Amino acid sequence: MNDAECLSHLLQVCSRKTEEFVRTLDTKHMVWLLEIEEEARKMFSSDFNAEPELMPKTPSQKRRRKKRTSILPDENRDPSGRRISRRRSSANWSSSVRRLSVRNQIKANDDSIQEGPAQPKRMTRARAQASIMCPPAVEQALPESPSQLCQKSVQVKISEHERRSAEQKLRESEIEDSEMKTDVQPIPEITKDHISEIMNAAGPPPIPDIPAVPVTPENKSRAAGKLKISGSSTPIQTAAVVDLTCESPRPANELVNEQPLNLSNESATPTGSKSDRRSVRRSLVVRKSSSRRASLVSQFSLVSKRESMTREAVRKSIRQSISKKKAAMETSSTSSQRSCHSSIEMVDDEITIKIRPETAPSETVSEEAPAAESPRSSLRSRAFKKIAISNLSESEEPPRRVTRQMVAVDAEPTPETADDAQNNRRKSYKRAVDELSDDERPSEGECSPPRKKTPSPPCPPSKIVKPPPHMKSFLHTVQKNQFLMMTPGSIGKNITLKSFIKRNTPLKPDPKSEEKERQRLDALRKKEEAELQRKQKIEEGKKRKQEELKLRREDRLRKVLQARERVEQLEEEKKKKFEQKFAQIDEKSEKVREDRMAEEKAKKKTMVKKQEEVECRRKQEEEARKLKAKQMEEEERRHQELLQKKREEEEMERQKKMAEAKRLAEQERERQVFAEKERLRAERERERIEREKALQLQRELERAAQEKEQQRREAEERKKREQQQRLEQERLERLRTEQEVKRLQEEQQRKAKEQAAAAAAPVMNVTVDMQNSPACESYEMTPKSYKVPSVKANADNYGMDLNSDDSTDDESQPRKPIPAWASGNLLAQAVSQQYYKPIDADHMYGTIDSPKLEELFNKSKPRYFKRTSSAVWHSPPLSNRHHLAVGYGLKY
């Protein structure tokens, strides 16, 4: 038996773990996969202008985004094309609200309708008092199956075209799935996939409790509400307004039934009875409905965070203006019933109203749970608050249109309805004022679970506050903006523009006139005091603005040197200004003052603690300073000792260096003495060698002179012998010539004799002997040429001047023998003598005078003094002129 229980327990644990795993897959991993698929589709779509929103932008990309205009039209941009002003003034809040509502309409049509946890409902003092008397309503059980959910009757207004398409879709769905039967007319936009997603979101698996969001100045300003989407001319664009008519909690299954949208062509505003109406301001600040599976892109992208910050800023500015007007209305207690009725008419005056049947229970309000903030969202960017879609009536009676004339007919002053209408108006106005003051007056039970709101007790007309004129103009502006935001198709025939102000003077005068007068005087006094306070605040604001202008001027002077820090400082200053403004407005309520006092006490404690820490730190620093001083003194002493030791070492080193220098100087002196001795010895040796060389040269010269004298004598003797030989030869030549002359004369005489004898004797038979004939011996046939006897030249004269062309001489076999003085000892002696005793050319030839250029170039013409050359002429410097030759130096 124990084993069976263990097995069953194990199966239960396994099933629970499996369900938790499946739920984790559905709620976490599938969401990530769907987001990744969505981003992939965006990336691979044809629209490449869209930037991935998961990536953060740098400041330069933000500035470039503002400057660069896209060629393709951007559906998220303002159609007017004007730049959004960064100032949070009351002049342009309506345009920003209009842009936000248009973006919410576009995003609401693109995203699938999913269920999300509701926001915590703010509890006012009246709600807290009412919650004590009335216990909270018990939640109904969730539907068990999708068929039970679909069998709920939902009232949807559709057009004729949508009705035909819905019928066709219904027939197709009946053929495909015969089990799917419902009374709801299908709409083309709402398919089975959407219904299955809704059922999965509200299915049986238990959802873990989400911890409540801590109450902070940022979170406490967000009011809870229901979102009701009214139809427009097209089923794609729907107007989103906030329905705040329901006060009691509503079961979760009714929230699922609220998902189908109203797609009628006529616009409607959420107005129930007059007692259940809320301020028109709440209908403007709307938010997109998001689910528990909210898009990660909208949660973590910078674009969504910037949009949420813009919405929060607009909403805070609206709440600030409302709180100011509320403070003025609370201080001034005007008791006129006409102001009461006019204020009621200002609150509930709208273009068209859509009311619920009288039988509809007013307690059906869904219970709102606190939404957990994402851990990845920063303090600057807040996650979107999830607003549930308002509940449609479960009654079978269809919604009916009510105009102002119908309300006036219903509100005719009968004895029964007059008091009811007055009470309803009182309740409506008190509830509107309470709802407007939710953000500025938090109650003690703000974090407690919401309870049912009981109607306030009847309020006399004297307690109702007349709104100031600027609120009337504000409501007029709201109505005009609502009218401008509508599409042309959404304006039907039943829409009529009425005035906000209605003069509803009460019929019965109040009998307590004296009390009223006293209250009126008190109200006037309070109003004057409030006016004085307002003027003082205005003066303070002016002073603060002057100080801010002064700071801005100083910033403008510093921005040239601090270009990069200036942008960050401006952003920080803007953020601080907004925070200061919001903090100043929040400080008007007593709760904030109490918190501030508590904070001041805590600050005093922290300051005391900080002072103690500073004193302790100062003591520690003093001790550390003393210890450091001691260490410094010790370090200085060690340093002085080191310096003294270093000086002593330097002195020893200097003495060593001086001793070394002395030793080196002594060695140098000894070396110089030794070198001088060596030089003297070498000089003496050189002089000895020179003397020996001179003596040897002298001996050689003497020997050469002797040889030369001997050669001269031999030459003279040779000349004498030659002279004698020449004279003897001349004498012999004369004798020979004289003998020849004598012989010739004798021959001539003999011939003459023979000729004479021949002439006398006969010549015919005479035989002549040629050999012995004197004719043959009379002359020579070829006489020898006469040669001039060559005179014997000087042996030292080699005819170098005459025969200077010796290039053909062979050095090994010269034509003339080399003389003795050109080789051998004579040549060496001549060279050594010329080396040691050079010839004094100046003494031999005299001093050579420098040439005078005036004498060489005696022409003087003007054109000679002009330089016609393009070259740059520079005279040589005077310091270099002594290097020039004497003959080439210029004389000045």
Curated annotation (Swiss-Prot):
Residues 60-69, 316-326 have a biased composition (Basic residues). Residues 50-124, 160-182, 255-286, 305-470, 502-555, 569-687, 702-760, 797-819 are annotated as: Disordered. Residues 512-725 are annotated as: SAH. Keywords: Cell cycle, Cell division, Centromere, Chromosome, Chromosome partition, Cytoplasm, Cytoskeleton, Kinetochore, Microtubule, Mitosis, Nucleus, Phosphoprotein. Component of the chromosomal passenger complex (CPC), a complex that acts as a key regulator of mitosis. The CPC complex has essential functions at the centromere in ensuring correct chromosome alignment and segregation and is required for chromatin-induced microtubule stabilization and spindle assembly. Acts as a scaffold regulating CPC localization and activity. The INbox mediates interaction with aurkb/aurora-B. Component of the CPC at least composed of survivin/birc5, incenp, cdca8/borealin and/or cdca9/dasra-A, and aurkb/aurora-B. Interacts (via C-terminus) with aurkb (via N-terminus and kinase domain). Interacts (via N-terminus) with birc5.1, birc5.2, cdca8 and cdca9. Interacts with mtus1. This is Inner centromere protein B. It comes from Xenopus laevis. The gene is incenp-b.
